[in-house]
Structure formats: structure tokens, C-alpha cells
């Protein structure tokens, strides 16, 4: 089934300029709708770890983008205080008490998750925003005013602190989603964008900005890398001097590996999770 879906969506992507809400073949509509439904359920995901390496399913990202091409904007109720006007409904628009109980997560007003995002058991959504195609795994806390961008992959037992920005893939168009692996702590107001991967058990301090062009300096080895934080790293904001010493530019600094003291400071509070 997935192979057939992929073929339909890949073909539709090549002909996307010809598609509109009023002009799209039935099989394309059905394929895109099914892909979004499977993303919403967590049965499919835009990226997954296979044999230790992350594989990005580009066809699912295409399905997300095509869904915007196929839908008209429509009014959407907003709890009586306002209205929205958009192409993508809320994930929870038609949820019943039984649906929430089966999902096993908490949604604190006025948190928003778009249809096509997956929220796993024991996740806590504080007043935050989770975009279409995102995958938020078990036990994760998305704290107040944090944003989880389109198709971003958030692992198990992650803490996204207040105001954290996890970048999406839709605009500007990105090849790969941001990936935050299991047991990571992302400090307040930090930003991780442009397909950066933060490997498991890492701690990103408050106010760290990570994109593909951000230099990542390892204090222990003196090495500079880009686009990936190694597993178990503690990262803070810093600066590196220019070669001529005339100025310095922002960088992220790996100051040490996570130890018991660090883990105690950023440990998850189980009282906030579960039924």
C-alpha cells in the first residue's frame, strides 16, 4: 500500500503546478488524504531511524506540501472567542473524551496541533504549537510557547523548554527535517532549524541557535563541525574569533559530556506525566 501511495504522490508532485482544489484527480486526493491520516496516527512518519541511521521519506514530505495545494481555506471555530481561516484543521477538532483517553496525552489550553501531526502517549502539550507532519514521541514535554515545526521529529522523554523553536521544512523549503533524539533537553528560547540533528541524551543550554551554517566547536578536541550535535553533549552559546582577530562570530560550544550532575538538573518530572 505504501509503495502505491508513494508512486501516486511522486507523480502528483511532478505535476503539482496543474493541481488545485478544483482540479485534482480522485486518486491523488485519496492518496494525499490517506498519507496525512497515517501521519496523524503515527503509522507513517517523515523520518525514522533504520539500522542506526536516519532515513527521510521525501514522498511523505511531498504529501504534506500537496495537501496545501488541494485544499481551500475555510472558517474554523476557535472556542467561541474568534475564528481561524486556514487549509488544515486542528488535530483535536473532532476529538471526544474517549479519543483523548485513548491518546493518553495532555493538551493544555490553548495548545494547538494541526491534523497530520502525531502526539504519543504521556506527551504534555503546554500552550504551544505543533505543525503538520511533526512526530512527538512518548513522554515528551512541549513547554509554553514552544513550536514544533512541520515534519520535525521529536524523540522520547524530550523536554522542549519555554519558547523553543524547532524548525519546519515547508518555508523556507528544507531537504530534511529537524530531529531531536531521545532524552534530550532543549533550553528556553533555543532554536534548532534547517535539518539539524541533536543526538540522544544531549543538553542544549538556554538561548542556543543551531542551523546548518552554525559552527559547533568542541572545547575538548578543538574540532569544528556542522549540522549535528553528538550524543550526550552539553552545548552552550559562544563565539569564535576571526583569523585576524578583528571580530568574533557566534557559535555553539560543546563544553562537556552529560554527567550525573547535569542529568539531575534537567531530569523529567514524572508527576506531570501519565494518566
From Swiss-Prot:
Reaction(s) catalysed by this chain's protein: (S)-2,3,4,5-tetrahydrodipicolinate + succinyl-CoA + H2O = (S)-2-succinylamino-6-oxoheptanedioate + CoA
Key words, A-Z: Acyltransferase, Amino-acid biosynthesis, Cytoplasm, Diaminopimelate biosynthesis, Lysine biosynthesis, Repeat, Transferase
Enzyme Commission identifier(s): 2.3.1.117
Binding positions (substrate): 106, 143
UniProt keyword Transferase present: yes
GO molecular function per UniProt: 2,3,4,5-tetrahydropyridine-2,6-dicarboxylate N-succinyltransferase activity; nucleotidyltransferase activity
Domain of life of the native organism: Bacteria
Keyword Amino-acid biosynthesis among UniProt keywords: yes
InterPro entries: DapD_Trfase_Hexpep_rpt_fam, Hexapep, Hexapep_transf_CS, THP_succinylTrfase_dom1, THP_succinylTrfase_N_sf, Trimer_LpxA-like_sf
Gene Ontology biological process terms from the UniProt entry: diaminopimelate biosynthetic process; lysine biosynthetic process via diaminopimelate
Pfam families: Hexapep_2, THDPS_N_2
Subcellular location, record wording: Cytoplasm
Pathway assigned to this chain's UniProt record: Amino-acid biosynthesis; L-lysine biosynthesis via DAP pathway; LL-2,6-diaminopimelate from (S)-tetrahydrodipicolinate (succinylase route): step 1/3
Name of the top EC class for this enzyme: transferase
GO cellular component terms given for this protein: cytoplasm
HAMAP family recorded: DapD (MF_00811)
Family affiliation: Belongs to the transferase hexapeptide repeat family.
Oligomeric and partner information: Homotrimer.
Name the UniProt record assigns to this protein: 2,3,4,5-tetrahydropyridine-2,6-dicarboxylate N-succinyltransferase
Taxonomic lineage from the root: Bacteria, Pseudomonadati, Pseudomonadota, Betaproteobacteria, Burkholderiales
Amino acid at each position: 500500500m505504501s509503495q502505491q501511495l508513494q508512486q501516486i504522490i511522486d507523480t502528483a508532485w511532478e505535476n503539482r503546478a496543474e493541481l488545485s482544489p478544483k482540479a485534482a484527480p480522485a486518486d491523488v486526493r485519496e492518496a494525499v488524504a490517506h498519507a496525512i491520516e497515517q501521519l496523524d496516527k503515527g503509522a507513517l512518519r517523515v523520518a525514522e531511524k533504520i539500522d542506526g541511521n536516519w532515513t527521510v521519506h521525501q514522498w511523505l514530505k511531498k504529501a504534506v506540501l500537496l495537501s496545501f495545494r488541494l485544499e481551500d481555506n475555510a472558517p474554523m471555530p476557535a472556542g467561541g472567542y474568534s475564528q481561524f481561516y486556514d487549509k488544515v484543521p486542528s488535530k483535536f477538532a473532532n476529538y471526544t473524551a474517549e479519543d483523548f483517553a485513548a491518546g493518553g496525552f495532555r493538551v493544555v489550553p490553548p495548545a494547538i496541533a494541526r491534523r497530520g501531526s502525531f502526539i504519543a502517549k504521556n506527551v504534555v502539550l503546554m500552550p504551544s504549537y505543533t505543525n503538520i507532519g511533526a512526530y512527538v514521541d512518548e513522554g515528551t514535554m512541549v513547554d509554553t510557547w514552544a513550536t514544533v515545526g512541520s515534519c520535525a521529529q521529536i524523540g522520547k522523554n524530550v523536554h522542549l523548554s519555554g519558547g523553543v523553536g524547532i524548525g519546519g521544512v515547508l518555508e523556507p523549503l528544507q531537504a530534511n527535517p529537524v530531529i531531536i533524539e531521545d532524552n534530550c533537553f532543549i533550553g528556553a528560547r533555543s532554536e534548532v532549524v534547517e535539518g539539524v540533528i541533536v543526538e540522544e541524551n544531549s543538553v542544549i543550554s538556554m538561548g542556543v541557535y543551531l542551523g546548518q551554517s552554525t559552527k559547533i566547536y568542541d572545547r575538548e578536541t578543538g574540532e569544528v563541525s556542522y549540522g549535528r550535535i553528538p550524543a550526550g553533549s552539553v552545548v552552550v552559546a559562544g563565539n569564535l574569533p576571526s583569523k585576524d582577530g578583528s571580530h568574533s562570530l557566534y557559535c555553539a560550544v560543546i563544553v562537556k559530556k552529560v554527567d550525573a550532575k547535569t542529568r539531575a538538573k534537567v531530569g523529567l518530572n514524572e508527576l506531570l506525566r501519565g494518566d
